[in-house]
Amino acid sequence: MKIYVCLECIFIGMALMLMLFVGAAHAETASVYGGRDGYCGSRTANGERVNCSAMTAAHRRLPFGTRVRVCHSRCVTVRINDRGPWVRGRDIDLTPAAARAIGLDDTGHVTLSQL
């Protein structure tokens, strides 16, 4: 009986951890980079050039190449190819094209889910 209880606890714990790391949508604060700040054409942390018309983003922790769904008034899928943002209180930096696609002007709250 004790073994079944232990196994059940382990299973529930693993399920909760999986929900935290894969696909769980959560609120984050997004900002726009690569437009007026002069980053267009500069190198990203993974060596690519910042392409202001691409659907890419910068995130501090997600691995390069990770695809995330970002929603504001609309939703778009972006690929993480840079590190940042380095401004306190912000969680993800979007290129101008990605920000326009979701209706984000400058800085705002978005829903983020990893694909």
Regions found by a protein language model. Name each.
Residues 2-8, 16-115:
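Secreted/periplasmic proteins
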